[in-house]
């Protein structure tokens, strides 16, 4: 179940607000310029689908975003617990960073935790299958896939070069709850 938990920048263990209601989550995030929507990830992709299979299954959703926002490229990120690079990838994504473009993800399988550092608060967004999130360019954030990752998401970019991060050097992510 998707969830949003909001923390103070100074109080990392006691949430200010929490909800699992998609409409409430969308309202809170939209007020901060973050797009959150529930879409339909209803295609049977089989076990550990190839990127091409995922793209073909959801080309209609990609086309909608491209027409709406002019995005230029897309790919698929899919990680499973047996990935030999899972620890290194988790460590990389757990470092607070920004992007020069929106970070758009449509989760078609599994889950991951986006943590957004907006002003003096941290918004932890548990994204699961059917969730679309778009983190605005320049928003400091990090992503937790958990110690046993199991997710597939379509990544959509303004930049044809794909995922390019500028790491902030702030260790704030270390202070907040993570996925098991």
Curated annotation (Swiss-Prot):
The record marks 105 as: Important to generate the dianion. The record marks 96 as: May play a role in metal incorporation in vivo. Ni(2+) binds at residues 97, 99, 103, 141. Pathway: Amino-acid biosynthesis; L-methionine biosynthesis via salvage pathway; L-methionine from S-methyl-5-thio-alpha-D-ribose 1-phosphate: step 5/6. InterPro entries: ARD, ARD_bac, RmlC-like_jellyroll, RmlC_Cupin_sf. Monomer. This is Acireductone dioxygenase. It comes from Enterobacter sp. (strain 638).
């Amino acid at each position: 179940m998707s969830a949003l938990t909001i923390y103070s920048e100074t109080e990392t263990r006691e949430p200010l607000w929490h909800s699992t209601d998609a409409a409430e989550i969308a309202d809170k995030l939209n007020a901060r310029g973050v797009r959150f929507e529930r879409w339909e990830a209803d295609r049977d992709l089989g076990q550990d689908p190839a990127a091409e299979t995922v793209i073909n299954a959801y080309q209609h959703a990609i086309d909608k975003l491209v027409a709406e926002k002019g995005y230029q490229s897309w790919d698929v990120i899919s990680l499973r617990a047996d990935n030999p690079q899972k620890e290194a990838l988790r460590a990389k994504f757990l470092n607070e960073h920004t992007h020069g473009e929106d970070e758009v993800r449509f989760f078609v399988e599994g889950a991951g935790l986006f943590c957004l550092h907006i002003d003096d608060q941290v918004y932890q967004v548990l994204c699961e299958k059917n969730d679309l999130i778009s983190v605005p360019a320049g928003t400091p954030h990090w992503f937790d896939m958990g110690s046993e990752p199991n997710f597939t998401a379509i990544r959509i970019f303004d930049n044809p070069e794909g995922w390019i991060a500028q790491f902030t050097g702030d260790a704030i992510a270390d202070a907040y709850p993570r996925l098991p």
